[in-house]
UniProtKB/Swiss-Prot annotation:
GO terms for molecular function: calcium channel regulator activity; ion channel inhibitor activity; toxin activity. This is Omega-sparatoxin-Hv1b. One of its GO terms (cellular component) is extracellular region. Coiled coil: none annotated. It is found in: Secreted. It comes from Heteropoda venatoria (Brown huntsman spider). Its main location: secreted. The keyword Repressor does not apply. It comes from the Eukaryota. Keywords: Calcium channel impairing toxin, Disulfide bond, Ion channel impairing toxin, Knottin, Neurotoxin, Secreted, Toxin, Voltage-gated calcium channel impairing toxin. The presence of a 'disulfide through disulfide knot' structurally defines this protein as a knottin. Belongs to the neurotoxin 10 (Hwtx-1) family. 02 (AU5B) subfamily.
Amino acid sequence: ADCGWLFHSCESNADCCENWACATTGRFRYLCKYQI
């Protein structure tokens, strides 16, 4: 199954790859970023 790649738009962590998080980058944009 595909998962949200880096900087892929998302609504929640479920939209991102495992160990990635849906993080805000601005007022309304949420993008997948790697969780260390």
